[in-house]
């Protein structure tokens, strides 16, 4: 099995926005099996991927992409501080997660969610802890609570989508990724995750290609691995 790990907002220093941001410990956004598109350096026609790495995005805007959507993640746009009384507790929870002391992290995060139920980040991280402990039902509840606390928390939708995908609930996972994209159409990770879901688990290759191309379009510089995935997917579709 091939693991593609993305650490999102994982920080050891609690900043002014620490309790508002969705700190994620080793967020496994993209866990794909060996059928993940090959990251080869050659196309079937013998050309290097580098020769076509900008093929998606430069020739036009991907279908269905909202170019007029805000450029800033709406969850991060809120610059308000979190409660000062929770910062030390949250920092200790993050430290416990770094040390993989899941039981201590659980206790600290449960305390945070009890004392500060309007904060989304602690619920999100509690869900990640439960996921690590293979307590999937508890993890699902925590991720849903994170979304309830702040419906703009894109990481929570994606973590929930990952969990549901692992359980074989592909339609439910799809719904979570779609919700994240509805919140912010320019969230690249959501497009990548739903693309993987469509490609590897639901057999919706054209939909997967569309979201992969949107992901690539959103990159400041073309992503070489994604370019390889797009080429492989087009080959399988017959484009």
Model-found features: residue ranges?
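Structural marker of alpha-solenoid helical repeat scaffolds
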Residues: 115, 149, 183-184, 217-219
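Canonical tetratricopeptide repeat
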Residues: 125, 159, 193, 228-229
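Helix-start (N-cap) detector for alpha-helical repeat units in TPR-like alpha-solenoids
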Residues: 86, 120-121, 154-155, 188-189, ...
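Alpha-helical segment of the N-proximal tetratricopeptide repeat
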Residues: 79-119
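Terminal, low-structured helical/coil segments at or just beyond the last alpha-helical repeat
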Residues: 200-239
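Structural signature of tandem alpha-helical TPR/SEL1-like repeats
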Residues: 99-107, 132-145, 166-179, 203-214
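C-terminal motif of bacterial Sec signal peptides marking the signal peptidase cleavage site
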Residues: 31-32
């Amino acid at each position: 099995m091939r693991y593609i790990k993305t650490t999102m907002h994982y920080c050891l220093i609690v900043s002014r926005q620490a309790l508002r941001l969705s700190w994620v410990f080793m967020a496994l956004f993209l866990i794909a099996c060996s059928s993940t598109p090959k990251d080869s350096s050659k196309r079937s026609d013998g050309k290097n991927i580098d020769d076509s790495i900008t093929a998606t995005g430069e020739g036009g805007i991907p279908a269905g992409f909202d170019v007029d959507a805000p450029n800033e993640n709406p969850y991060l746009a809120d610059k308000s501080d979190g409660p000062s009384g929770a910062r030390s507790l949250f920092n200790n929870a993050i430290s416990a997660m770094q040390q993989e002391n899941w039981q201590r992290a659980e206790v600290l995060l449960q305390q945070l969610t009890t004392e500060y139920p309007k904060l989304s980040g602690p619920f999100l991280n509690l869900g990640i802890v439960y996921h690590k402990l293979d307590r999937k039902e508890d993890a699902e509840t925590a991720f849903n609570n994170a979304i309830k606390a702040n419906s703009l928390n894109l990481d929570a939708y994606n973590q929930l989508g990952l969990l549901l995908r692992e359980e074989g609930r592909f339609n439910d996972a799809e719904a979570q990724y779609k919700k994240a994209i509805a919140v912010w159409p320019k969230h690249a990770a959501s497009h990548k995750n739903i693309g993987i879901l469509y490609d590897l688990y639901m057999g919706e290759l054209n939909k997967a290609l569309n979201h992969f191309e949107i992901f690539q379009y959103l990159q400041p510089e073309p992503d070489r691995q994604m370019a390889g995935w797009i080429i492989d997917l087009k080959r399988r579709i017959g484009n």
